[in-house]
Amino acid sequence: MTKAKTAPRTAPLVEPEEELILPETWRRRPWIPITILVAVLAAVLGAGFAMDKALQPVVPSQLAGCKTSTQVGPHEFVGLQPICIKPDKSYTATLYTTQGNITIKLHPEYAPVTVNNFVVLAVNGYFNGLTFWDAPDWEIQGGDPLGNGRGGPGYTLPEEKTNGLLWNPGSVGMARIPGGPVNGSQFFITKLPWPGPGPTAVYNYFGEVTGGLLDHVAAITPGDRINTVTITVS
């Protein structure tokens, strides 16, 4: 049996590339395309700057003087944040996340050092862009610059006990490893009541979610991000 021969392939004709022809006006005035390019670049950079400013936390005048302790590295400081909050004021934090906004009423009457620490970090942009690295059934956890549960601001917080308070859905506290100190920046928000009989260690209860926004908390999954945090004072 003779195999049929395949007809030899013919290379496709390739049309020569058309010469780029500039408009007559541009040929006479070569600076015009350069001017247009500069204008486009300026618009792009301007949009990026505007976006960056939009992600910056809005700082109320009462907190304009809230500065961090000496910074020794990215997301790292020498120690606790200087006291900035006032005992006669009320503070609310709004977390603008990839799943919607979460409003938290802060409780300095229960944990003044913790609330002050959170406020100072927030108004100085510490939490901007950080992810919620953990989100099991009953809570979500964020505030870790490393995004793996091992990070922090370079210092820890003292225990601030709140005897008798119930950890209901929407409660906000500070994370800690078993047997270790209270983390300086990692916080959690409960989606359900604390499992079992309640916590066996101090987790510095310092706030609660308000405004019926627990659906946004429940929607958070690992990898969701805090875009920015704003603090309001009343």
Locations of the language-model features?
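Cyclophilin-like peptidyl-prolyl cis-trans isomerases
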Residues: M1-S234
